[in-house]
Amino acid sequence: MANSAQARKRARQAAKANSHNSALRSKFRTAIKAVRKAVDAGDQAKAADLFKAAVKTIDTIADKKIVHKNKAARSKSRLAAAVKGLQAAA
């Protein structure tokens, strides 16, 4: 347990940051799942729209260092390949 005022404040700040970062990580995963779901359903237009929104979300979260920039780039690349594959199949 934190004894000093400084340690108590840092514990409060850490809890607040953890909560905020968890919400952003959840948003990241949800955006990816939405695109994957549209691709699996074969909905080309919806997948393209969701991909555009997902890229914005992924970039924002990577800029805030919630996820590593390489993970963000890898996620975007895989989603782009899935959407492009859907367009090629159509």
Swiss-Prot record:
GO BP terms in the entry: translation
Origin species: Burkholderia lata (strain ATCC 17760 / DSM 23089 / LMG 22485 / NCIMB 9086 / R18194 / 383)
Role according to the record: Binds directly to 16S ribosomal RNA.
Cross-referenced InterPro entries: Ribosomal_bS20, Ribosomal_bS20_sf
Region entry Disordered, spans: 1-25
Keywords: Ribonucleoprotein, Ribosomal protein, RNA-binding, rRNA-binding
PANTHER family: 30S RIBOSOMAL PROTEIN S20, SMALL RIBOSOMAL SUBUNIT PROTEIN BS20C
GO cellular component: cytosol; small ribosomal subunit
GO molecular function: small ribosomal subunit rRNA binding; structural constituent of ribosome
Protein's name according to its UniProt entry: Small ribosomal subunit protein bS20
Signal peptide: none
Gene3D superfamilies the UniProt entry points to: Ribosomal protein S20
NCBIfam families to which the protein is assigned, alphabetical: S20
Family: Belongs to the bacterial ribosomal protein bS20 family.
